[in-house]
Amino acid sequence: MSMVYANIFMAFVVSLMGMLVYRSHLMSSLLCLEGMMLSLFVMMSVTILNNHFTLANMAPIILLVFAACEAALGLSLLVMVSNTYGTDYVQNLNLLQC
């Protein structure tokens, strides 16, 4: 495994560990999710460029589209929770059920 792949994998693991450690705050969880998506995007792009996968050129862009949708939904949920309760705790999400 080259150093590029090792660094990208390490970034993914650090984001995953941050997700496990800072799971009580919604903003921290969203930032860790974005870090995971960014490392997956870079890993996919580097793999496609190194192996010359011509059929998979659109896969990283599709991943970015899903990451943007996830970020928009997460931020709207963060705004709704912080306006309703004044904090960004994940435990407040259970109170939003109908």
Curated annotation (Swiss-Prot):
Its EC number is 7.1.1.2. The chain crosses the membrane at residues 1-21, 29-49, 61-81. Its main location: mitochondrion. It is an enzyme of class 7 (translocase). It comes from the Eukaryota. Keywords: Electron transport, Membrane, Mitochondrion, Mitochondrion inner membrane, NAD, Respiratory chain, Translocase, Transmembrane, Transmembrane helix, Transport, Ubiquinone. It catalyses: a ubiquinone + NADH + 5 H(+)(in) = a ubiquinol + NAD(+) + 4 H(+)(out). It is found in: Mitochondrion inner membrane. One of its GO terms (biological process) is ATP synthesis coupled electron transport. Pfam families: Oxidored_q2. It is a multi-pass membrane protein. InterPro entries: NADH_UbQ_OxRdtase_chain4L/K (IPR001133), NUOK/Mnh_C1-like (IPR039428). One of its GO terms (molecular function) is NADH dehydrogenase (ubiquinone) activity. Core subunit of respiratory chain NADH dehydrogenase (Complex I) which is composed of 45 different subunits. Core subunit of the mitochondrial membrane respiratory chain NADH dehydrogenase (Complex I) which catalyzes electron transfer from NADH through the respiratory chain, using ubiquinone as an electron acceptor. Part of the enzyme membrane arm which is embedded in the lipid bilayer and involved in proton translocation. Belongs to the complex I subunit 4L family. This is NADH-ubiquinone oxidoreductase chain 4L. It comes from Odobenus rosmarus rosmarus.
